[in-house]
Amino acid sequence: IFFLFSCEKSDDNKIELFVSGAQIAGVNGMHFGPDGLLYAASVIGSDISIIDTETNEIVKRYDLSDGVIGPDDVAFNSKGEFYWTSILTGEVAGFNVKGEKVIAGNPGPGVNPITFSDDDRLFVAQCFFDNGLFEMDPSGQTAPRVIKDEIGEFCGLNGMDWGPDGRLYGPRWFNNEIVSVNVDTAEIRKEVGGLNVPAAVNFNSKGELFILDTGDGKVVKVVDGIKSDYALVELGLDNLAIDANDDVFVSSYSEGSILKVSPDGIEEVLPGGISHAGGIAVAGNDLI
């Protein structure tokens, strides 16, 4: 936010930085690429930022000029190609190994989480605008396959990951639970209940399940069906990602921050701040 101290022409006029915002306009889905860098999607910012979590720097950014439109989540296949979902338009697209944009299809607005299986099958689900689960053709040559056209009220699945049992795991936002899906038979099984507002799941290399419960502002760890609080963070969280060292990172849609979290504490990767301000007003001595 900048303050302009006068509207009259004068050599004394100046623009002063009053408060700086977040480096990303609200962080949504995240995924570590084969290069070890963290790829973070932003719907409001309409970009995908690539972050070095060792130096805490944004090293590259894909935006509208690259054909990235309102991305909500991002995922990689075994070739190193990455795809994203555009929640507002319904487009599912990616960049192939040549760096060319490829449109996989459009199952409709609300496409939110995205993931590749180990054999490079592409899956997306809808949340908030609709509630379906689909398999997509990454090349866009065949229409999306409907696995389930209604998984949960107002939201199918959010941030998804593959379990060690080969099933697709994901949170049902409004149902306070985690389910798994057999993507070939569409059979759904409840895995974890008693959550507040689960937003995302991820497995580490040991096969341990981590859940981001955005309603309670915390990360929950599940081992042998037993839940425990892994890290108490803050409200306004959106998604989580786990790196090759099993370190856990969470994103904030409200603050635009990325945090590394553990039972020992919280480390800032990207600090939060004003991430999508809509206006400004002054009331007495208060800036609103």
Give the ranges of each region predicted by the language model.
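Hydrophobic residues embedded in beta-strands of well-ordered beta-sheets
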Residues: 38, 58, 82, 92, ...
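Short loop/turn segments that connect beta-strands within beta-propeller blades
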Residues: 52-56, 95-99, 136-141, 181-186, ...
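Bacterial Sec-dependent N-terminal signal peptides
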Residues: 4-17
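A short loop-to-beta-strand structural motif that recurs across blades of beta-propeller domains
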Residues: 47-50, 91-94, 131-135, 177-180, ...
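N-terminal, post-signal-peptide region of Sec/Tat-exported proteins
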Residues: 33-60
